[in-house]
């Protein structure tokens, strides 16, 4: 959405009450031999600025008497969101790399990382950013342009989302 319409995808996902958010990207690096897939999640629990942003985004009123309670609730919400996002990121990374290896060819697994990406800030649902390969690497650029690779990345993400949703449904049913 962002490139085509000038929007952050969360401008659509948050008001629509989305259950999760996946942002797809092609990576780049000055060293043209860099390759691989990596998945990021936002971990705001330790970031004061992000915690204040979450307070604002979640509409918490930080009145004098309730300020500490609101901060505790915001911190708990941020930690729960980071845990869910990390779990989703792990599933996406695992399914995308395994699927590409099985159906397209070898791929470097660069792992799951947390970072302060603008596109993930303010998500009111588990949110991840997937770097599907390095467009600065000629071989990966060709791979990224191939329908076969794109289909397998999409299929891997779909498998991860299905697993994540089933797991969330089991947790909700157990409550």
Residue ranges of each PLM-predicted region?
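Active-site-proximal helix/loop segments of hydrolytic enzymes
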Residues: 1-175
């Amino acid at each position: 959405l962002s490139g085509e319409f000038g929007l952050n995808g969360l401008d659509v996902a948050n008001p629509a009450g989305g259950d999760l958010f996946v942002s797809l990207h092609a990576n780049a690096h000055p060293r043209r031999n860099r390759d691989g897939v990596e998945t990021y999640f936002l971990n705001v629990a330790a970031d004061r600025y992000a915690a204040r942003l979450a307070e604002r985004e979640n509409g918490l009123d930080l009145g004098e008497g309730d300020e500490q309670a609101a901060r505790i609730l915001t911190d708990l919400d941020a930690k729960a969101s980071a845990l869910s996002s990390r779990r989703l990121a792990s599933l996406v990374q695992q399914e995308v790399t395994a699927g590409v290896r099985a159906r397209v060819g070898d791929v470097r697994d660069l792992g799951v990382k947390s970072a302060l990406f603008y596109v993930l800030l303010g998500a009111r649902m588990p949110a991840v950013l997937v770097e599907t390969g390095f467009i600065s690497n000629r071989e990966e650029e060709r791979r990224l342009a191939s329908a076969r690779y794109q289909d397998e990345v999409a299929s891997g993400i779909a498998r991860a989302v299905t697993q994540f949703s089933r797991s969330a449904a089991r947790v909700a049913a157990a409550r």
